[in-house]
Curated annotation (Swiss-Prot):
It holds the Pfam family Ribosomal_L23. This is Large ribosomal subunit protein uL23. It comes from the Bacteria. GO terms for biological process: translation. The lineage of its organism: Bacteria, Pseudomonadati, Pseudomonadota, Alphaproteobacteria, Rhodobacterales. HAMAP family: Ribosomal_uL23_B. PANTHER family: 60S RIBOSOMAL PROTEIN L23A. Part of the 50S ribosomal subunit. Contacts protein L29, and trigger factor when it is bound to the ribosome. It comes from Jannaschia sp. (strain CCS1). InterPro entries: Nucleotide-bd_a/b_plait_sf, Ribosomal_uL23-like, Ribosomal_uL23/eL15/eS24_sf. One of the early assembly proteins it binds 23S rRNA. One of the proteins that surrounds the polypeptide exit tunnel on the outside of the ribosome. Forms the main docking site for trigger factor binding to the ribosome.
Amino acid sequence: MSADAKHYDVIRKPLITEKTTMASENGAVVFEVAIDSNKPQIKEAVEAVFGVKVKAVNTTITKGKVKRFRGQLGTRKDVKKAYVTLEEGNTIDVSTGL
C-alpha cells in the first residue's frame, strides 16, 4: 500500500514523552493526529506510511488550556492523540531523525 498525501494530513507528528516511551515497550506508538480524523483513517495512514500492521487504535482528545497573553484571554488548540498498538513483530522507531 503506497502512502498518499491524505495519509500525511492525518498523522501530524509522533509524541515522545516518558509515558509514550513506556508504551512503546509494549508495542504501542503515540501520534498527534488531525482532530477530525477517525480510527479507520488513522489505521490506514499508519499502515501506509510506515509499512506495518496495526492491531488497535485508541484515541483521546485533550482540550486546549485557557491562557493569558498581555491581559487578553486566549485558548490553545485542542489536541487529538492516537495510541496505535502494532501487531507482533512490527516496530516503528520514531526516535530516528532527532
